[in-house]
């Protein structure tokens, strides 16, 4: 899209990257890669409840074990699909490993309070803020991983969607 923005009729200053869960990992990784490669310039990154830390050492990754919802075991299986045994992951595979979060695009994100990735996301958001990156983040009480996809008609899901759309509208209207 960035390389062919003229052909596509796309404003190269209004590009965002977004993803859910493992896709949230990819969105954060693409933001890091775009920064490190000096392009494309992203106006927003939207890693929603991203799987950001392959170490699975946070309190929430230890305490969310109910197999009726996304839990620690699911996280481990997910990471095992991405990382080979003995492989030392990079920041592009596990964005929480990044030493430097400065110079990244603004972030919008949300997560459920009962998501095993809650604490790794909270830590990542805090590190972004400490690096001077604008961050808008929301933790939805009583909600689990992918809650807005599981129960899209719920008021909390509608609120999560509207907050996301509003963040994208704001990012795309700047310029």
Regions found by a protein language model. Name each.
Residues 1-175:
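Alpha/beta-hydrolase superfamily serine-hydrolase fold, recognizing
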């Amino acid at each position: 899209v960035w390389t062919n923005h003229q052909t596509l009729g796309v404003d190269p200053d209004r590009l965002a990257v977004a993803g859910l869960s493992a896709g949230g990992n990819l969105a954060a990784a693409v933001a890091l890669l775009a920064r490190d490669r000096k392009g494309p310039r992203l106006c927003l990154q939207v890693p929603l409840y991203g799987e950001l830390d392959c170490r699975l050492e946070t309190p929430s990754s230890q305490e969310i074990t109910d197999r009726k919802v996304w839990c620690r075991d699911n996280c481990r299986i997910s990471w095992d699909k991405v990382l080979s045994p003995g492989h030392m992951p990079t920041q592009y595979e596990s964005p929480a490993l990044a030493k430097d979060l400065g110079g990244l695009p603004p972030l919008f994100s949300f997560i459920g309070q009962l998501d095993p990735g809650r604490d790794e996301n909270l830590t990542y958001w805090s590190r972004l803020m400490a690096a001077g990156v604008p961050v808008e983040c929301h933790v939805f009480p009583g909600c689990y991983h992918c809650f807005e996809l599981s129960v899209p008609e719920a008021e909390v899901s509608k609120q999560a969607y509207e907050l996301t759309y509003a963040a994208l509208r704001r990012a795309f209207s700047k310029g």
